[in-house]
């Protein structure tokens, strides 16, 4: 059971996209990375080929390391930024539940 899962809302802690929020689209456990919607956008220039007669410029979300991400306890508003939190685990009724450390509530 991972601390960050697919469809979780996360905030970027460091790097060019610091402070940006997005939903986790995909996890890559082998690289300890995740693809987050709207974060770490890269562009790729494709040359013309037999299949693709016109060259093109593609934009896509590149993976970002999990160590640079934190789960969002409370979403951002106009007045206040998003509150990042660490994740803990608690066993209730023989089930392992994720807990937000800042709020103490189940995720």
Swiss-Prot record:
Source organism, top-level taxon: Bacteria
Cross-referenced Gene3D superfamilies: 2.30.30.30
Keyword vocabulary terms for this entry: Ribonucleoprotein, Ribosomal protein, RNA-binding, rRNA-binding
GO MF terms, alphabetically ordered: rRNA binding; structural constituent of ribosome
Assigned GO CC terms: ribonucleoprotein complex; ribosome
SUPFAM superfamilies named among the record's database cross-references: Translation proteins SH3-like domain (SSF50104)
GO biological process: one example: translation
Classification via InterPro entries: KOW, Rib_uL2_dom2, Ribosomal_uL24, Ribosomal_uL24_CS, Ribosomal_uL24_KOW, Translation_prot_SH3-like_sf
HAMAP family in UniProt: Ribosomal_uL24_B
Family note: Belongs to the universal ribosomal protein uL24 family.
PANTHER family linked to this entry: MITOCHONDRIAL RIBOSOMAL PROTEIN L24
Assembly notes: Part of the 50S ribosomal subunit.
Purpose: One of two assembly initiator proteins, it binds directly to the 5'-end of the 23S rRNA, where it nucleates assembly of the 50S subunit.
Protein name as catalogued: Large ribosomal subunit protein uL24
